[in-house]
A protein has these predicted regions:
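NAD(P)+-binding Rossmann beta1-loop-alpha1 motif at the extreme N-terminus of oxidoreductases
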Residues: 1-57, 61, 130, 193-195
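Short, well-ordered alpha-helices that flank and scaffold nucleotide-derived cofactor binding pockets
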Residues: 17, 21, 25, 49, ...
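Rossmann-like NAD(P)(H) cofactor-binding subdomain of soluble oxidoreductases
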Residues: 35, 41, 50-51, 59-134, ...
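Internal alpha-helical scaffold of NAD(P)-dependent oxidoreductase catalytic cores
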Residues: 106, 110-115, 131-169, 180-219
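A short glycine-threonine-serine/GTX helix/turn-capping micro-motif
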Residues: 170-179, 228
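Interdomain hinge/lid region at the active-site interface
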Residues: 184-274
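Conserved small/polar residues in nucleotide/adenosyl-binding loops
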Residues: 277-279
Length: 279
């Protein structure tokens, strides 16, 4: 694998900062080989001061010598960025996109470039505890696959899939997943306060219960339903609570919500394709 690659990140937001921190933590490349390009001078200065990377405002100049270009912009800014970068990236460079809904074909057409990885990280990636699902175009070399794997591993766990359709599925399940978890946590905390706990104690109980349950599951070699049954005594409090959740359609609501997110992800992707036709 290439040593000390030149890496340019377009769109220096929170996820981009997580990538920068991870790259430096893993010593994948030195800070002087990392460029963060964005319109805000103060943001570039902040990243330079904190990490020692190079801030740019002109995307075309930023990608000129890049071995890897990471697209980390909002979907609504993608059209402008692709228009700027079309034909500007070295043919042998690897492009990694974390733009939600942007397909390999959309990116390839917009950039006039065909060596592309499409990925979907999630919010915990900002502390190195995320999970990223990714797919590589056929033109990505084995060496670049390994480089992409190391870059995405800076965000937490990573899963390379063989079908790009899995990216829309991942958007609905893991990409949007933290929102479901936070809503569930909020509901549990509010229920605890309703029972009479001070909010501080309710929050502590919920957080540790979730953390401990996940750790416990990962240390067992059984199906998650078996663990649920294990803590559900006939006629007990767990059985009563689960009865009400099932009666309220808890499981169905989750399934339908994730399916709706999946359909919305596909819609957004089609919208991006249509908006980029006129580039």
């Amino acid at each position: 694998m290439q040593e000390n690659p030149n890496i340019t990140i377009i769109g220096p937001g929170a996820m981009a900062e997580a990538i920068i921190a991870g790259l430096l933590r893993q010593q994948l490349t030195p800070p002087e080989n990392i460029i963060a390009s964005g319109p805000r001078i103060e943001r570039g200065a902040e990243l330079h001061q904190h990490y020692g990377i190079q801030p740019y405002q002109e995307n075309v100049l930023a990608v000129k010598k890049a071995d890897v270009v990471i697209l980390s912009v909002k979907p609504q800014r993608l059209q402008k960025v692709l228009s700027e970068l079309s034909g500007a990236i070295k043919p042998e460079a690897l492009v990694i996109s974390i733009v939600a809904g942007a397909s390999i074909q959309t990116l390839a057409d917009g950039l006039n470039h065909h060596c592309i990885v499409r990925s979907m990280p999630n919010t915990p990636a900002q502390i190195g505890e995320g999970i990223t699902v990714w797919y590589a175009s056929e033109t990505v070399s084995d060496e670049q696959i390994e480089l992409a794997r190391q870059i995405l591993a800076a965000l937490g766990q990573e899963i390379l899939v063989e079908d790009e359709n899995y990216l829309d599925m991942a958007t609905a399940l893991s990409g949007t997943g933290p929102a479901y978890i936070f809503l569930f946590m909020e509901a549990l905390m509010d229920a605890g306060v309703h029972l009479g706990f001070p909010r501080r104690i309710a929050e502590q109980l919920v957080i540790q219960t979730l953390r401990g349950s996940v750790d416990y599951y990962e240390n067992q070699s059984v199906h998650v339903a078996d663990l649920r049954n294990k803590v559900t005594s006939p006629g007990g409090t767990s059985a009563e609570a689960l009865y009400y959740l099932e009666k309220a359609g808890f499981r169905t609501a989750i399934s339908r919500a994730i399916w709706a997110a999946y359909e919305r992800s596909k819609e957004l992707g089609k919208g991006l394709e249509l908006s980029l036709i006129h580039i």
